[in-house]
Amino acid sequence: MSKNDLVKTLRMNYLFDFYQALLTKKQRNYLELFYLQDYSLSEIADTFDVSRQAVYDNIRRTGDLVEDYETKLELYSKFEQRREIYNQMKASIEDPDALKRYIEELEELE
């Protein structure tokens, strides 16, 4: 698995966590098997008795859909921003002014 594949898989795992409630059962099943459980397209096709191409198309469309949700709702992006601010806060624990600034940044995200 290349670094780009790993980054995409990690991103899709996060997007799945944030947006799975907005997906159909079939979409959830396909994404979960492909990205979380590392099933191949053929294994998923055999499991659901459909063609490999049907699985590929569904995963691609569903991936596009969760990316669209992220563009509109920005749940993952804001999660990443909050995580970075928390890390900065931990590093600045002795600086009250910096902590106040980070708290204000967190408030702006909400």
Swiss-Prot record:
Q: Which residues form a coiled coil?
A: none
S-S pairs: none
A UniProt-annotated Pfam family = UPF0122
* Gene3D superfamilies recorded: Winged helix-like DNA-binding domain superfamily/Winged helix DNA-binding domain
What functional role does this protein have?
Might take part in the signal recognition particle (SRP) pathway. This is inferred from the conservation of its genetic proximity to ftsY/ffh. May be a regulatory protein.
Belongs to which family? Belongs to the UPF0122 family.
Question: What name goes with this protein?
Answer: UPF0122 protein Sca_0859
Instruction: Show the taxonomic lineage.
Output: Bacteria, Bacillati, Bacillota, Bacilli, Bacillales
